[in-house]
Amino acid sequence: MPLAKEIPTPYVWSYQPQMGVPAGASQDYSTKINCLSAGPRMAQTVFALRDQRNRVLTAEAHGQTPRPVVNPASWPAAALSHEPPPPTLLTLPRNEPTEHAMTDAGYQIAGGAAPWSGVKTGSFCGRGLQLAEPPTTAIYPSGLFHLGRGQRLVLDHQPARTLLLESAPSVPRYGGIGARQFLKEFTPAVYPQPYSGPPNTFPDYFCFNYDSVSNSVDGYS
């Protein structure tokens, strides 16, 4: 078909999640237009847009995948993107007796009131801690800061009660690639002559059963 020879459709890669490797590429026939219902002017306009799109896709394929072999048989650790695992958020238990004891002992971040004797509870005993004038804040069991003169400042006290754990693998990952790296590097590729080109120019790595070690497709000589 002359129209198909003139304007090739891009090859879209598929992903094999179990092995972490691309499973070949196939033509995206959804990008074809219905040439029977399109007039000559519309067809030429669409062809020009499609040709420009193919140039953009080709440039992306060369830029995003700068490897000698597009789909190698094995992926060394240096070629894999090492993304840290998501952090784990742990909620720490509250120590209510300690908070009550601190409040009863009169802990203040700032204030000017005369030092006063606190209530002795266990090993917590205080006479107040004041830093500045006038009376300003005291820590309450609720975890909020209480301002002097009847005002209250509500702060987000969750960070003080949570623990964020972040970990990273001690050994670099190797083997297959992840889905995010696949989407980033295996952009749609364009084969200029999908129907009229000689067989030896077809990119064999588009085939899902292509073996890059032997440079052959399984089942074909």
From Swiss-Prot:
Modification type Phosphothreonine: residues: T65
Gene Ontology molecular-function annotations: hexon binding
Propeptide section residues: 113-150
Annotated Gene Ontology cellular component terms: host cell nucleus; viral capsid
Post-translational modification comment from the UniProt entry: Cleaved by the viral protease during virion maturation. May cause the middle segment to be shed from the capsid.
Site (Cleavage): G112, A113, G150, Q151
Expression induction: Expressed in the late phase of the viral replicative cycle.
Keyword Zinc among UniProt keywords: no
Membrane spanning stretches: none
Record-linked InterPro entries: Adeno_PVIII
Domain of life: Viruses
Keyword ATP-binding among record annotations: no
Keywords: Capsid protein, Host nucleus, Late protein, Phosphoprotein, Virion
Subunit structure: Interacts with the peripentonal hexons as well as the hexons in the facets. Part of a complex composed of the core-capsid bridging protein, the endosome lysis protein VI and the hexon-linking protein VIII; these interactions bridge the virus core to the capsid.
Miscellaneous comment text of the record: All late proteins expressed from the major late promoter are produced by alternative splicing and alternative polyadenylation of the same gene giving rise to non-overlapping ORFs. A leader sequence is present in the N-terminus of all these mRNAs and is recognized by the viral shutoff protein to provide expression although conventional translation via ribosome scanning from the cap has been shut off in the host cell.
Family under the similarity heading: Belongs to the adenoviridae hexon-linking protein family.
Name under which the protein is recorded: Pre-hexon-linking protein VIII
Source species: Porcine adenovirus B serotype 4 (PAdV-4)
Gene this protein is translated from: L4
